Amino acid sequence: MNSPQRLSTYWVTCADGLETLLQQELQGLGIEQTERFAGRLIFQGSLEQAYRVCMWSRLASRVLKPIHTFELERTHDARDVAEELYEGALSFDWSLIFAPQSTFAIRLHVEREIKVNSQFATLRVKDGVVDSFMEAVGRRPSIDTKQPEITLFVLAGKTEHTYCLDLSGDSLHKRGYRHYMTDAPIKENLAAAILQKAKLTELKPDLILDPMCGSGTFIIESLMIFTDRAPGLVRRFGFNGWHGHDRELWLELKAEAAERHEIALQNTLPKFYAFDADWEAVKATRQNIIAAGFEKLLDQIQIEERTLADWPSFENTYNTAFVVTNPPYGERLGDKASNRALYLGLSALLQQYFPKQHAAVIAAQIEQADVLAFSEPETLRLMNGKLPIYIRLGQVKPVANSQPFLANWHADPVEIEGAQDFANRLQKNMSALKKWAVKDQVFCLRLYDADLPDFNVAVDLYGDRLHVQEYAPPKTIDPEKAKKRFNLALAAIRAVTGLPREAIFIKTRARQEGKNQYTKQSTASKRFIVQEGQAKILVNLTDYLDTGLFLDHRQIRLRIAQEARGKHFLNLFSYTSTASLHAALGGAASTTSVDLSNTYINWSKENFVLNGLTVDHADEQHMFFASDCFEWLKEGHEQYDLIFIDPPTFSNSKKFYGTFDIQRDHVSLLKRAMNRLSAEGTLYFSNNYRGFELDEEIDAIFYAQEITNDTIGPDFKRNQKIHRAWKIQHPHMN
């Protein structure tokens, strides 16, 4: 292999955006000088160097050897490009390149400015090659578009057409191991490029994780890198039928590559983890790993069906970790909001399990990548086929503050003229709630609820932000006086909590009836994540009077989380389905959420996706219905072990059949729901109507136990009428 060889020109093509990385890779293969173009590098080199690129390049798409250039005499608009391509092919003696008994295929690439029917032009190139053979040797080769022995790559340009021998045959991204496919896969060479951009070999991780592994491409490409496995070692190439092929040289290069791989297999490898929520993807990953020749390494690769909500603890399992994944964006997941929730949830998991470790995540839109909590992030834009993708790489930021806001709050003296009583009461409430909030890790709670008649507001804490609701004053109160008092309250709130103005969101709340209870307040959507128990929940303090999380039902949701394991759970009037979310995270066998509003059903799905749970999935474990709850109960027959009903006081929605009044209609609602409750099941019923009384008929036919006191948290003890709640079971249970 050390004998001098004649230098030739070679083109190495790649996906747009990979030129710099490919240039670095070629330098590592001993090719120092390259000319760079969009999607292509050109070098002058030996056949051995071209073979090495075929064997070792993890990033290239094709290796082309220009054979013939046909210069054009005319370039005006009326040119017949297809005929030019025919003439160019005919003008060269192709019998010098391959034998007539060989099969061949044509790949045509036309520069953007040129207008021509590509299919017809490809046929004319084929005609030119065939006619050239007939003139030269009196025989013609056959076409084989599936597995040709020779592939000719033709570039149709403005001033010339270039005819190349494609040494690659098939595109180099086809390593030969992907026998099983999943939706929206990443090409093998793009996966390798991401690993190279992440400087995987320099990181030297002892743990590599792909939590949404699809067909296992990242895991397999990582294995190939760490075992020094040449990507071209076991695949077919396009030079075997070429007259200029040096078979002895190629076999020497193959032997060298095989030896390097065998030596590297003796090295200590990282531990590999491949998870996916789809069992078909798990099977595909396992089969593709075997097809890639790594069956003996399966004991070092943990391949499991897992959702993001079901990650194992990685504590004390690594010193340096690397996480890389291609989430199911776009085609596999659906709407943009759910996509954003998926990336938010993934980011939170990375912060929880892999702080300060490196990660690389693919996104379909840059907005998805922007929610990832990486320090000093890098972004790589590539083309995966015809789809642009963004790769965000960086070091995972640690969680800024994992403790409730009250844990670090202190009751410092404040003076607010005109609102001192209010400031004192707010401070007293916060001091009283602090111990409980820290002990039970409560991040969202009510701090004040019209405790003083002159300050008729509710103050709710969501993480490190405040939601302040001003109850509409009676008509007898001077509006200017009410406005002044409210502004004093805001000043006191800021002084007591220490939170800046931008962390305080203000609403005016009147008694809500019917459709007005969900009136949108503004056009800007500013959802953010809060924690409740195991659940991460999206709340919105700007767009609606309600935030997406009813704080007074916290204790019921946590009770459901404790009781849901292995049970089938039904949530009627589910709103944003936070109770369903708690049930799912608590191990429910299934959850079903029903609400009339498409808006809240979509919000519900985002909450599930945020927590790594699958929605709209083949196994239908978590189902959502935008439907009238009465009609839905009437139409189905499925039985549930645990049911939660938290209906509105009143509704006259256009989607509703008539009107709904909780006092008038609760008997028929509960009867229908109890028909869907399993024999040993439990139904929790709650509502916020202050004058509500449970009808005696319910007590007569079911076992109904009022549990209101058990469902009101310490932050609502000052308002015992915030809601009423019952535990209802079939009579034989007691």
From Swiss-Prot:
Domain of life, per lineage: Bacteria
Domain THUMP: start-end pairs: 49-167
Broad EC category: transferase
Molecular functions per Gene Ontology: 23S rRNA (guanine(2445)-N(2))-methyltransferase activity; RNA binding; rRNA (guanine-N7-)-methyltransferase activity
SMART domains the record matches: THUMP
Subcellular location per the Swiss-Prot or TrEMBL entry: Cytoplasm
EC number: 2.1.1.173, 2.1.1.264
Disulfide pairings: none
Keywords: Cytoplasm, Methyltransferase, RNA-binding, rRNA processing, S-adenosyl-L-methionine, Transferase
Cellular component terms per the entry's GO annotation: cytoplasm
Pfam family of the protein (one): Methyltrans_SAM
Matching CDD domains: AdoMet_MTases (cd02440), THUMP_AdoMetMT (cd11715)
Alphabetical list of InterPro entries matching this protein: 23SrRNA_methyltr_KL (IPR017244), DNA_methylase_N6_adenine_CS (IPR002052), RlmKL-like_Mtase (IPR000241), RlmKL-like_Mtase_CS (IPR053943), RlmL_1st (IPR054170), SAM-dep_methyl-trfase (IPR019614), SAM-dependent_MTases_sf (IPR029063), THUMP_dom (IPR004114)
Plastid keyword on record: no
Family annotation (Gene3D superfamilies): 3.30.2130.30, RNA methyltransferase domain (HRMD) like, Vaccinia Virus protein VP39
Similarity remark: Belongs to the methyltransferase superfamily. RlmKL family.
Function text: Specifically methylates the guanine in position 2445 (m2G2445) and the guanine in position 2069 (m7G2069) of 23S rRNA.
Protein name: Ribosomal RNA large subunit methyltransferase K/L
Organism per entry: Acinetobacter baylyi (strain ATCC 33305 / BD413 / ADP1)
